[in-house]
């Protein structure tokens, strides 16, 4: 299981990186806007800054929704750094663009995936990653983790090399459910990654150890 952090915040990326468990970063236009990063050139400089922190894959999303625009933007993004993975929405022109990028050796992350059918098309087109959105499906009373498990089974049955990147993860519980479902990658907020470390018995045990140590060393 790989851990990606889902943010454009450099401080959070550094903190996750310093834990020693970070394998990559995913971003999107909403996350860029949240950090107040405006304009194409500023966003691309920001991607380069992220790549300078993390040695793993960094997903950078195209803004265009037409085939020609996605191909143009994707090539420009891929040229920024070898770690860039071009993030493409799962729409008809997006699938076409993924197929084009696959033939050119440009790695892709097919995003906004909500069904096994979409995941199948992404894999057939040669996507490096496919991103089923767990939390957003849960929001409408559908089974997000179940979709992850279904995609994993499908890919293994047909031997597709596309990696399942569980996205829209809201909690540490989501992470562990996606681990059990067989996801290759979980991309999540820093709070969810740090939440995996927390357990009341760990805190209580450490407190007891320190108290006992002080008693015999006073």
Curated annotation (Swiss-Prot):
InterPro entries in the cross-refs: Aldolase_TIM, TAL/FSA, Transaldolase_3B, Transaldolase_3B/F6P_aldolase, Transaldolase_AS, TSA/FSA_arc/bac
Keywords for the protein's UniProt record, in alphabetical order: Cytoplasm, Pentose shunt, Schiff base, Transferase
Molecular function per GO: aldehyde-lyase activity; transaldolase activity
Location in the cell: Cytoplasm
BP GO terms, sorted: carbohydrate metabolic process; pentose-phosphate shunt
An example Gene Ontology CC term for this record: cytoplasm
Reaction it catalyzes: D-sedoheptulose 7-phosphate + D-glyceraldehyde 3-phosphate = D-erythrose 4-phosphate + beta-D-fructose 6-phosphate
Highest taxon, organism lineage: Bacteria
Catalytic-site annotation from UniProt: 87 (schiff-base intermediate with substrate)
UniProt pathway annotation: Carbohydrate degradation; pentose phosphate pathway; D-glyceraldehyde 3-phosphate and beta-D-fructose 6-phosphate from D-ribose 5-phosphate and D-xylulose 5-phosphate (non-oxidative stage): step 2/3
A Pfam family that the UniProt record links to this protein: TAL_FSA
EC number: 2.2.1.2
Gene3D superfamilies on file: Aldolase class I (3.20.20.70)
Family (UniProt): Belongs to the transaldolase family. Type 3B subfamily.
HAMAP family linked to this entry: Transaldolase_3b
Purpose: Transaldolase is important for the balance of metabolites in the pentose-phosphate pathway.
PANTHER family tied to this protein: FRUCTOSE-6-PHOSPHATE ALDOLASE 1-RELATED, TRANSALDOLASE
Name this polypeptide is given: Probable transaldolase
Organism field: Bacteroides fragilis (strain YCH46)
């Amino acid at each position: 299981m790989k851990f990606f952090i889902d943010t454009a915040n450099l401080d959070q990326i550094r903190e996750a990186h310093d834990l020693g468990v970070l394998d990559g970063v995913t971003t999107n236009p909403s996350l860029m806007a949240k950090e107040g990063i405006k304009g194409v050139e500023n966003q691309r400089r920001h991607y380069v800054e992220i790549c300078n922190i993390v040695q793993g894959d960094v997903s950078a999303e195209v803004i265009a929704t037409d085939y020609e625009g996605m191909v143009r933007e994707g090539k420009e993004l891929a040229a920024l750094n070898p770690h860039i993975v071009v993030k493409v929405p799962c729409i008809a022109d997006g699938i076409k663009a993924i197929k084009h990028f696959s033939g050119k050796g440009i790695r892709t992350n097919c995003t906004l995936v909500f069904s096994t059918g979409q995941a199948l098309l992404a894999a057939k087109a040669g996507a490096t990653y496919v991103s089923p959105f767990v939390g957003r499906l849960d929001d409408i009373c559908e089974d997000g983790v179940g979709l992850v498990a279904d995609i994993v089974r499908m890919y293994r049955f047909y031997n597709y090399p596309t990696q399942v990147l569980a996205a829209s993860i809201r909690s540490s519980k989501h992470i562990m459910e996606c681990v059990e479902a067989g996801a290759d990658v979980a991309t999540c907020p820093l709070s969810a990654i740090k939440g995996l470390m927390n357990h009341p018995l760990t805190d209580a045990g450490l407190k007891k150890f320190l108290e006992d140590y002080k008693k015999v060393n006073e």
